[in-house]
């Protein structure tokens, strides 16, 4: 660089960007300032949805929805984690899911909600090795603390 030839001790290791531990799953890369427990969360997801070819999923812009809301992030998470509003807000989803069989499971570091399909509605073909084999699952909704949401439907 012009006029930089007289600078001493640059670059040095302390000039580098910080590095953070990373882990990957199905082509997704995860990191955090002080990550803990992500392996357990990924293990939970692997047992439930690991049979899906997630690493081959492709973005479909036609299915993208963007909503700008003025709310605290905790209120948004609370809304995501409760299914009570589904019959009143999400008409299409309510026609697909059996609200009486909507399930919420807590695991270390996150929450999984499982939407069971009504009779005749689309659902996953779940393999025998899955803990959900035999269920007509239409959707898996994962929330990983503090703010990662993964939806599979």
Predicted regions and their residues:
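C-terminal catalytic domain of Rieske-type non-heme iron oxygenases
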Residues: 21-24, 28-153
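Long, hydrophobic, well-ordered secondary-structure blocks that form the structural core
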Residues: 1-21
